[in-house]
């Protein structure tokens, strides 16, 4: 992966407050990384946003249930009460200079890592954001780096969607809860991503760029490659092996 060039990083010195004005969505990999880096339980930093639907057919790709009811949830980074109606991220550090810095920068969620860049088709664009006008000049950033990073992020959200779908099939057999309890879901995530990490470290470093690029090819077509039959996928050795490892980790093997 290419190193990020700090000299062209518009976030340095910015006071626009994305760390106190936005809810940050979390994928399972985010939860696993932060919990392991800080040696804390996910319940310390994960909050749950509720979305009621009429049936399970209306679930979004990242929505999970806890029982047979139609109530669904998705994970966001917890916040604390701030001033002026702001809700700073639980990990935001307020400096004497009135600047804000991330307390978990090396383990920050992938949504934070990519903000405010995204793909529009095959192009990288700056999506509407809290950033000052003109802060992100795409002629001055390393687009090769960002293409790989955004491809990696696409992959992690696809894996999360696959993990959530597997969980939802599991809990459809459970009776409706009398009291909400998110701990079983969080434990499921930690177990899956711990198994997946054992496989992740076995992927050759030089193989990742190709895997992310191929993943992006699928997600650009609104396809999660984990939902395809193996014969429909790519025959490249690292790609095929990685997909197999993900499926095995989610299945509990």
Predicted segment positions?
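Short loop/turn segments that flank or connect secondary-structure elements
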Residues: 1-253
